[in-house]
Every structure is written in structure tokens, then in C-alpha cells.
């Protein structure tokens, strides 16, 4: 089946799920999102880009940004990150303080909030301006030089960052924070507030589908680094539902509470879906279902 027709079919199949779930309400600016919206885009390694539904509508990327900050730190050749952050699934909520205390300030993986704060902290040390460098990178890889930071979301998220502040201060108490906590939180909420469409996100995700090669053909990550990021996406990318996601979808994916999910079929394509209604674990209800349909209909999987 031709890809555009396939995406239209998937959009029709998940129609009953549009409006399901709950929008993220702990960030007031996200609580106003329309749960009925849905978009899907596929960017193929040979250059084809296809979409259906609200695939050009921008949304807050939130935790999906963690994929790219991790890539940027590893691209600097700085493997010291792995002394500060683990690579194991957490099995706990993404903002858990209990697990961080149990493991003495070392986050379980780079995609839970504590781990992502450590990655942003490391990127600040490496570049001086984590969010500025991330935004420039995403604008280039998405071929959209106008990608913005949604200031309304950033301000709202910063005003309700108590849990992330607690995580960062807790890590600092164990010596696992290099920069001032307030600076790290400021950069972190701004990186999460970058607004991208499914189209933009799928284009940017091709970095991992191409095994670390940028859109201009230059190498950015080694093949091994890209493989490892994809592996962590598969095992840790959908909060404490990673096992269910791997079982049903079967490809690496990273979700965000803005309702987006970036998924990678290595060597083939990057897929981005968006629908703001979330399940109790913080993953898009319609988005996960759409990716399940996508891998079932294409037969593409890493297994």
C-alpha cells in the first residue's frame, strides 16, 4: 500500500480513540490542548515524506526533546555522562523522587526527568547554551528554520516546576549537578517547550533512522551511538509503559506529555504521531494505537 494511503487508513482506524484519555493538566498551558486532534507523519530515509490528519499542526515536544539532547551530548564524544546516568528502565513514574533517593542521586536512565536534567546539565557544560544549540540543531534537521519556543508553555512549566526542582536539588546534594540548579531548570523547561509538528519531528528523527547521519549527509553520531540511543528509546522511552509499547509496537519510541511520540524504524523511516489525550502513564492513547496499526500494516519491527 502506498504510504500516504496507509496513513489515511490509520487515521480512519483510530478515529474512535480521538478525544480519549486526559490532557496533561499539571502544566496549565498544556491543559488547553484539544484532545480530538490527531496527526501522523512518516519521513523515509530515501527522502519521501508523508502525512495525514493534523500533521502540520505544532505542539509542545516536551520529553521528546530528551532524545536530541542525549544525541548532542554523545556527539561531543562525552561518555562521562554514563557515570551520572544509568541505562535501565525505571518501572516508576517519570518524575519519581523515591527511586532517585534509593539510588543515591543517580537517575535510572536519561529519559526520566531526573536523567534528562543531568543530560541538560552536561550539555550546558559542553556548549554553554543547551537550548540554543538544541533549537539550532532541530531547525536544521527538520528543515524548518522558524521552529519556535512556545513561551507561554515555558512560562507555565517554569511556574509549576516544583517536582523537577526537587529532583535537581536532590541530585545536587549527591554531587550529580555541575551547574546552578535554577539555570538547569530554566534551560530544561525551554527545551521541552520547543514547538514542532509531526512533519518537523519525523524529519528530525531521520538522524536515528539513518544510523546517525544528518540530513546533509554528514556523520553526527557513530552507528554504534545511534543504535544505543534507539535501544534506550525502546526500553525506556515511554515511561513505565515501555514493555507494553515494545510488545504492541515493536520499534523504538519516545513520548512526551504534549501528546507526541517519535518512533524509529532503523534503516527505513522516522514516524511522528500526535494526539493530546494521554493514558494514565502519560502516553498518547491515539498515538500508541496509530503506531500499533502502522507496524502491523507495514510488518516493520526491530524483532
UniProtKB/Swiss-Prot annotation:
Catalytic activity: L-glutamine + H2O = L-glutamate + NH4(+)
One biological process term in Gene Ontology: glutamine catabolic process
EC numbers, comma separated: 3.5.1.2
InterPro entries, A to Z: Beta-lactam/transpept-like, Glutaminase
Pfam families (alphabetical): Glutaminase
Binding site for substrate: 63, 113, 157, 164, 188, 239, 257
Domain of life where this protein originates: Bacteria
Keyword Hydrolase: yes
Keywords associated with the record: Hydrolase
SUPFAM superfamilies referenced in this protein's UniProt entry, alphabetically: beta-lactamase/transpeptidase-like (SSF56601)
Molecular function GO labels: glutaminase activity
Family: Belongs to the glutaminase family.
HAMAP family registered for this protein in UniProt: Glutaminase (MF_00313)
Quaternary organization: Homotetramer.
Protein name: Glutaminase
Amino acid at each position: 500500500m502506498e504510504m500516504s494511503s496507509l496513513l489515511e487508513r490509520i487515521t480512519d482506524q483510530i478515529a474512535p480513540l480521538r478525544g480519549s484519555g486526559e490532557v496533561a493538566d499539571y502544566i496549565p498551558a498544556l491543559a488547553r490542548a484539544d484532545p480530538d486532534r490527531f496527526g501522523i507523519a512518516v519521513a523515509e530515509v530515501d527522502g519521501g515524506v508523508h502525512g495525514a490528519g493534523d500533521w502540520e499542526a505544532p505542539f509542545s515536544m516536551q520529553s521528546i526533546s530528551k532524545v536530541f539532547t542525549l544525541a548532542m551530548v554523545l556527539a561531543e564524544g562525552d561518555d562521562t555522562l554514563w557515570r551520572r546516568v544509568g541505562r535501565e528502565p525505571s518501572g516508576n513514574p517519570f518524575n519519581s523522587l523515591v527511586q532517585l533517593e534509593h539510588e543515591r542521586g543517580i537517575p535510572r536512565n536519561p529519559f526520566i526527568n531526573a536523567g534528562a536534567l543531568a543530560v541538560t546539565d552536561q550539555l550546558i557544560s559542553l556548549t554553554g547554551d543547551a537550548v540554543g544549540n538544541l533549537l539550532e540543531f532541530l531547525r536544521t534537521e527538520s528543515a524548518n528554520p522558524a521552529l519556535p519556543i512556545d513561551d507561554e508553555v515555558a512560562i507555565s512549566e517554569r511556574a509549576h516546576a516544583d517536582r523537577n526542582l526537587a529532583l535537581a536539588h536532590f541530585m545536587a546534594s549527591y554531587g550529580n549537578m555541575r551547574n546552578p540548579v535554577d539555570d538547569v531548570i530554566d534551560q530544561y523547561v525551554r527545551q521541552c517547550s520547543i514547538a514542532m509538528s509531526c512533519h518537523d519531528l519525523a524529519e528530525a528523527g531521520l538522524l536515528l533512522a539513518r544510523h546517525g547521519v544528518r540530513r546533509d549527509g554528514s556523520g553526527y553520531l557513530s552507528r554504534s551511538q545511534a543504535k544505543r540511543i534507539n535501544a534506550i528509546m525502546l526500553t525506556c522511552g515511554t515511561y513505565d509503559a515501555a514493555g507494553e509499547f515494545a510488545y504492541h509496537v515493536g520499534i523504538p519510541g519516545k513520548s512526551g506529555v504534549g501528546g507526541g511520540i517519535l518512533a524509529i524504524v532503523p534503516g527505513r523511516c522516522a514516524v511522528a504521531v500526535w494526539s493530546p489525550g494521554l493514558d494514565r502513564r502519560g502516553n498518547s492513547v491515539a498515538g500508541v494505537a496509530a503506531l500499533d496499526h502502522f507496524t502491523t500494516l507495514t510488518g516493520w519491527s526491530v524483532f
